[in-house]
């Protein structure tokens, strides 16, 4: 999704147009398939490159509503800890707060994302109820947590990695907007240095 040195608005608009082409191709093959946009854990923080997720999401949602309001779209979120190598995400209330304007969204404050998506649904009239007007747990903008993980470079870190992994699955299962959760890696990747995110060591 690298678009060069462009504004958030221009980047999100280009992304939305590409998404619309992808959506048509996917639906032609499988009309029941869901199509997702991908966002990382940076929510309002400015890191010097890329675009803050909240601003990007706002512009994407606006463009989609203005041009193709009938197209359904969903969010693949990557709720890594901040910093990336932190396992005890539940102790981070400085960069991952409960505010809509939090700097980052990790598993510690995942509800900030899903609550904000509900606001977008209401803003643009995205259907999230059944035919009788009752809340539809499978309707509206759905979420998959498509990439996250916790480090264990040695046996002393295994317990904290296991605790973080178990807790993330508990949080995801309790959130009615989340349909799936996938960890970053099964095996450590030596090329990633200290980011030993695999559930198993790579001894090769």
Residue ranges and their predicted role:
Residues 1, 38-40, 186:
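Short loop/turn motifs enriched for small/polar and acidic residues
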Residues 1, 75-77, 183:
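Non-cysteine beta-strand/loop elements that form the S-adenosyl-L-methionine
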Residues 9-158:
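Noncatalytic carbohydrate-binding groove/subsite architecture in carbohydrate-active enzymes
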Residues 3-4, 98, 154-204:
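Aromatic-rich peripheral "rim/lid" segments of glycoside hydrolase catalytic domains that contact
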């Amino acid at each position: 999704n690298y678009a060069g040195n462009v504004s958030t608005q221009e980047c999100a608009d280009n992304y939305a147009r590409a998404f619309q082409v992808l959506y048509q191709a996917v639906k032609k093959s499988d009309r029941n398939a869901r199509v997702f946009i991908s966002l990382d854990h940076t929510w309002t923080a400015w890191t010097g490159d890329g675009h803050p997720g909240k601003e990007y999401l706002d512009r994407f949602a606006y463009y989609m509503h203005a041009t193709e309001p009938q197209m359904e779209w969903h969010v693949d979120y990557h709720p890594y800890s901040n910093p990336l190598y932190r396992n005890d995400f539940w102790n981070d209330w400085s960069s991952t707060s409960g505010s809509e304007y939090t700097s980052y969204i990790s598993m510690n404050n995942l509800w900030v994302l899903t609550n904000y998506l509900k606001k977008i649904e209401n803003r643009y009239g995205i259907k999230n109820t059944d035919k009788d007007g009752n809340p539809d747990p499978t309707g509206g903008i759905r979420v998959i947590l498509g990439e996250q993980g916790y480090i264990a470079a040695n046996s002393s870190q295994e317990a904290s990695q296991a605790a973080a992994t178990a807790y993330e699955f508990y949080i995801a299962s309790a959130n009615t907007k989340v349909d799936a959760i996938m960890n970053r890696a099964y095996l450590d990747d030596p090329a990633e240095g200290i980011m030993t995110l695999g559930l198993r060591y790579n001894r090769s």
